[in-house]
């Protein structure tokens, strides 16, 4: 199971940050980071649920945020996937990433790994994956249009 910050954050942070998790242990990760209190998440796929995020080792509150659950195969990667929408301060982001990295069988994704998993699971074809890369890297209006 992998995780990564999906939001491009400036050094000063932002209002909101999104962290994605994908893989077989995604529900375990949700349970750990919410201390088993992600009420209704399984019954409400693709709907935002407000949750407290805690460090499972200390029970310390990290943040309050929205959790979205996308069960396989109807997710970007074709795997179980969730998004944690948190406040975008660097302190909150760094704590969440640190805690996720300490959960068993959960590791930081390599660059492009979410898209590679989508490609391998038949959710995208190669041209679409290249288009996503080009769109992410687009700096001009012309580059944005070509990527789409």
Q: Would you name each region that the model predicts?
A:
Residues 1-146:
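A glycine-rich (often HGG/GG-containing) alpha/beta subdomain
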């Amino acid at each position: 199971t992998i995780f990564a910050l999906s939001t491009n954050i400036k050094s000063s942070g932002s209002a909101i940050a999104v962290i994605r998790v994908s893989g077989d242990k995604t529900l375990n990760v949700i349970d750990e980071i919410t201390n088993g209190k992600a009420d209704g998440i399984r019954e409400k796929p693709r709907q935002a649920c407000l949750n407290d995020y805690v460090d499972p080792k200390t029970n310390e509150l990290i943040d309050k945020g929205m959790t979205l659950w996308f069960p396989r195969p109807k997710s970007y990667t074709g795997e179980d996937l969730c998004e944690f929408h948190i406040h975008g301060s660097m302190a909150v982001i760094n704590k969440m990433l640190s805690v996720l990295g300490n959960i068993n069988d959960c590791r930081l994704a390599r660059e492009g790994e979410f898209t590679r998993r989508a490609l391998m699971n038949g959710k995208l074809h190669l041209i679409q994956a290249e288009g996503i890369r080009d769109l992410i890297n687009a700096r001009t209006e012309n580059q944005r249009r070509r990527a789409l």
